[in-house]
Every structure is written in structure tokens, then in C-alpha cells.
């Protein structure tokens, strides 16, 4: 029995062995240089400037939408979700958190705030922890947890002016 098993294994091993030469691999084509009249990679289209009046209009149209922690649609917004949603309606991706949004765009001085700029406040911890969208040099729209709805407020109000951190202009 052992001998039969040994013969069977030897027959299988020799049956699987290669009986001829290994064929040569297919030749690989050499890379061609790019055609002189075609660009090697397409150039992305230039970004169009942000439509600031449309940003403000969208933000104002959402007044009265409820506050919802973690919310990012008209059924409920938190502050950064509100900003991300408004900018997305204009085809511009914005990060989802206040700290990431604060890292976007160019810093703008408090006297140069313009409609569509992001305004940041320190309401919970040191540094930016709340964000809104400027609708003029002295007003902004945001989703505060205190009132429960998206609303317009004055940047000069003592609560907001004492907590103002900075402004970012999104190109």
C-alpha cells in the first residue's frame, strides 16, 4: 500500500514538470515621447471667483432653520455645518469643523470684513470655536445653539465683539 502511494506521488510529480523551454515574455513597448502638438496632461480650468452675493443670499434664505449639533442640512445646522452647506450650494467644498474652516482662505482685518467672509469667535475654548458668514461689515448670519435657529446678529454686539477671533476671505 505504501509502495503504491509512493508510485502515485512520483507519477503526479513528474506529470506536472515542465517538458520544454519556457517561452520568452512578450516584449514591452518602449515609451513614446508626448506629441509636440498635444499637452502631456490637461490643465485644470481656472477657478471662478466666489459669487459673494449668492453666498449671502443662500445664507439669509436659511434663517429660521433649526440648530442641531452635528447638523449640516436645512433640517438642522450647527455653525460649521451651516457654513459648509452654504458654500457647497455655490460649488465650493469647505471642511466640516470650525478649526479646519479657520485654516482656509486669507486672514482679513476686522475693518475689512466683506459680505461672504467667514467670521470666527472663541465661545467654548481658546481659539476659534464658532463661525458665521458676514453679510455686511457689521452683521453676520450663523447657527447659534443659544437661540436654536439660524439668525443674523451684529458683529458689534458686546457678546460677539468680545469673542471675535478673526476673519477669513475665501477666494
Regions found by a protein language model. Name each.
Residues 12-15:
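C-terminal motif of bacterial Sec signal peptides marking the signal peptidase cleavage site
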Residues 64-115:
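Catalytic cysteine-centered active-site loop
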